[in-house]
Each structure stands twice: as C-alpha cells, then as structure tokens.
C-alpha cells in the first residue's frame, strides 16, 4: 500500500521537474511549446512514461517535437537524477497526449453548432 503512494508522489515530482527542465535547461527550439500533461511510473520505479502535448496541429511539428524530446532525453534524465532522491533514475519514454487537441476540436464543433442555430 505504501508503495502505491510512493509511485504517485514520484509521478508528480517527475512531472514538475521535467516541466522545469524543459523551460530552463533544454534550449532546443523543437521542444519550446511542449507541456507535460502526465507521468506514469512502473511499480518497480524503473521506467517512466511522460505524456506531453503541443498546441500545433501540424504532423510535421509533432514529428519535430518527438525528435527534439528524443534527443533531450539524456539531459532530462541526468537532471532528474541530480534533483530526485531515489536510488536509480527511471528510463524515460515520451508519448504525445492528444487529449488537448481532441478537447479543442470538440469545443470547435460545439461553437459551430451554436452559430448555426
């Protein structure tokens, strides 16, 4: 039971620190507009999946952002290792979170329906 709370606290801490690292340490323009939306960590604390969103709808921007994050993964992981007080820093993987774009698309459709009435 205590392990579950530890994982939750670690997920929140990783999310906060990765946001800070992306803002202050990573200078790659491809990751300039990235927002971290969530983190999931495995039960053994060995792997972390970081979910991110970008405001652009273009597929090319998504690919560039994914490439920029892949290139910055080593820096982000080493910074996390120095900031977190855990035995081993988890392996990081980044996955795009499309829920923000989905939500904005739903809002757009609702607004279009309101205008038609």
Curated annotation (Swiss-Prot):
The gene is rbfA. GO terms for cellular component: cytosol. It is found in: Cytoplasm. It holds the Pfam family RBFA. Gene3D superfamilies: 3.30.300.20. GO terms for biological process: maturation of SSU-rRNA. Disulfide bonds: none annotated. One of several proteins that assist in the late maturation steps of the functional core of the 30S ribosomal subunit. Associates with free 30S ribosomal subunits (but not with 30S subunits that are part of 70S ribosomes or polysomes). Required for efficient processing of 16S rRNA. May interact with the 5'-terminal helix region of 16S rRNA. Keywords: Cytoplasm, Ribosome biogenesis. Belongs to the RbfA family. SUPFAM superfamilies: Ribosome-binding factor A, RbfA. GO terms for molecular function: ribosomal small subunit binding. Monomer. Binds 30S ribosomal subunits, but not 50S ribosomal subunits or 70S ribosomes. It comes from the Bacteria. This is Ribosome-binding factor A.
